[in-house]
Structures are given as structure tokens and as C-alpha cells.
Amino acid sequence: MRSNVNRTRRRVARRVDPEKAGSMLLRIERTIRSIPRGKVSTYGGVARAAGYPGAARQVAKVLRRSFGLPWQRVLGAGGAIKLQGDSAIEQRLRLEAEGVRFRGRKVDMKAHEWQPRRAKRK
């Protein structure tokens, strides 16, 4: 019986145009910077707002590699803090300092979810 793991490892990585990848990361970074104080978004929400639905992992990558971003405003699905340990505590404290309310362990998304403006089409 063959293992699915071997098939997965043998997949050829998609070739990504470095210029397009850089543009994508910059758009994601700009989107994160545009989340106002007191509002939050999910990894998937940021990806959609940046024009890359399904690129939630790329949002996490940008947050890990960029400095000066309001990282605390990006949460897991449903408003859950996905960080562990002291980082999770720091994220919650930063959000509470911005006036974000929690319901148990999750942010009250009805009150605090950021709704980006949609660009008008011509």
C-alpha cells in the first residue's frame, strides 16, 4: 500500500513569478495596515480584502516577516486568538487597550469586525 505522504512530497512546487509574489505580499501588508484601531479581521478576511481569497497562510507569513504592522488586529476564524503562550496574552491585552471586547476567548466579531471598503468599478 502506497502512502499519501510520498505523493504529496513529490508534487512539483508551482513556479511563482517573484514580481507577482512581491506585489501580493505588499498588498497584504497594506491591507493589514489599513485595519483601524478597535477593529479586527481574520487571516482569511485580510486575504480577501487584499484581493487574494484563499491566501490566509500568506497573511500569516507577512505577519511573521514584517515589522511595525498592527499584528494584534489579525485573528483566526471566528475571532479566536491563534497565538500561543505569552504572545496570546499580549495580543489580548493590546486588543483590550484598543477597546476590543471579548466573549470568552473570542473577540466579539459582530461589534469589532473590520469591513473594508470595496473599490468602485468603472
Task: List PLM regions with ranges.
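Nucleic acid-binding interface residues in structured DNA/RNA-binding domains
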Residues: 2-122
